[in-house]
A protein has these predicted regions:
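Patatin-like phospholipase
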Residues: 1-46, 51-354
């Protein structure tokens, strides 16, 4: 019998709402196909995908992320006791500071003038003032699971951008700066003009989505034959003029879709199999226009589970994922017993049962 293919799971950006969509899709994959997304040989996360991927790589199963995202009471688990602060919106607690009315990155702004096509969106946002919202709440969420250091997963890559040079940095990959996972995720999520840049070892970092919505091209350097990519920021569906799936939204999603399509084609030319999952029409209606909305994730989670399950059933996509080694039962679906009785093996050290 041939060995199963080595896998890379690529999770793109998309704010709080995109993160909720990815969690719902990952749960559908686990329950419908029997494959544990956290068992991927590589996990590559950008922006919201770095938060979700970091949790998976730290051994948090999708069903627990579902419970966290919906704010469900899980008595007996530190930090997951059911208060409103446990919703996805906890990562957007507002810690304001007022920026100076100057360029956030004068060095990158000047570089973008000399080479206007080299830096993409990062070169444009260099001209904005610095963001006003602290990333500390993001770090707090990660530290609940990984208090310090990196996740135990051998190949968790977190993508950010050096805000002064415009260069892409892949934390967790060999040769990259050695930082805590909480700091790397905060850097990857630091939307310019919204969040503060994250200072690490004398450098400032911003959202890795300023290079690519998924950074799917990094999978070319991964020792993996099968690449599974979830991209909340693209879709093949169009709706009415002012709907989230309509032509106005499609215009903004179009660039993301075309870039990801080019990345997919490049990987396939290298002999890799690529499975791309994107929001369906119902998902787009649930997601709305505001990807940082704290009111939307609950309904997005439920919708994503439903639409992804329907897409997987009887499809080649579902068959390809079902052919992968089956995950442990308690990683695929939630135990029927009370949370306080769940075995410690279910959780990373930061989420042990009290």
């Amino acid at each position: 019998m041939a060995a199963p293919p080595r896998t890379a799971l690529v999770l793109g950006g998309g704010g709080l709402v995109g993160g909720a969509w990815m969690v719902g899709v990952l749960q559908a994959i686990a329950t419908e196909t029997g494959w544990d997304p956290g068992s991927a040989d590589y996990v590559i996360g950008t922006s919201a995908g770095s938060m979700v991927g970091g949790m998976l790589a730290a051994a948090v199963p999708p069903w627990l992320l579902m419970a966290y995202g919906s704010g469900e009471a899980l008595e007996g688990l530190p930090g997951l006791g059911g208060s409103r602060s446990n919703r996805f919106g906890a990562s957007l607690q507002i810690h304001w500071t007022f920026p100076r009315p100057v360029l956030a990155s004068p060095e990158l702004a000047l570089r973008s003038l000399r080479e206007p096509f080299k830096y993409g969106p990062a070169g444009i946002v260099a001209w904005l003032p610095q963001g006003m919202i602290s990333t500390e709440p993001l770090k707090t969420v990660v530290r609940q699971v990984v208090p310090q250091g990196w996740a135990a997963h051998p190949n968790l890559w977190v993508v950010a951008i050096d805000y002064d040079t415009g260069e892409r940095v892949v934390f967790g990959r060999q040769g990259s700066p050695n930082v805590d996972l909480a700091d790397a995720v905060a850097a990857s999520c630091a939307i310019p003009g919204f969040y503060h840049p994250v200072d690490l070892q004398g450098r400032r970092y911003i959202d890795g989505g300023m290079y690519s919505p998924t950074n799917l091209d990094l999978a070319a350097g991964a020792d993996a034959e099968l690449v599974i990519c979830l991209n909340p920021m693209s879709s093949r569906h169009r709706g009415g003029l002012l709907q989230p799936s309509g032509p106005i939204a499609a215009f903004f999603r179009g660039d993301n879709r075309r870039l990801v399509d080019r990345e997919v084609l490049a990987l396939r030319r290298k002999g890799k199999q690529v499975l791309l999952l994107e929001p369906q029409a119902d998902d787009l209606r649930a997601m709305g226009f505001n990807y940082m909305s704290r009111r939307t994730p609950g309904r997005v989670l439920a919708c994503a589970v439903r639409t992804a399950t329907a897409s997987l059933r009887g499809s080649k996509l579902g068959a390809d994922l079902s052919s992968l080694p089956r995950g442990r039962a308690d990683r695929l679906s939630r135990p029927d017993t009370k949370p306080s009785s769940w075995p410690p093996k279910l959780f990373p050290p930061g989420l042990q049962v009290a």
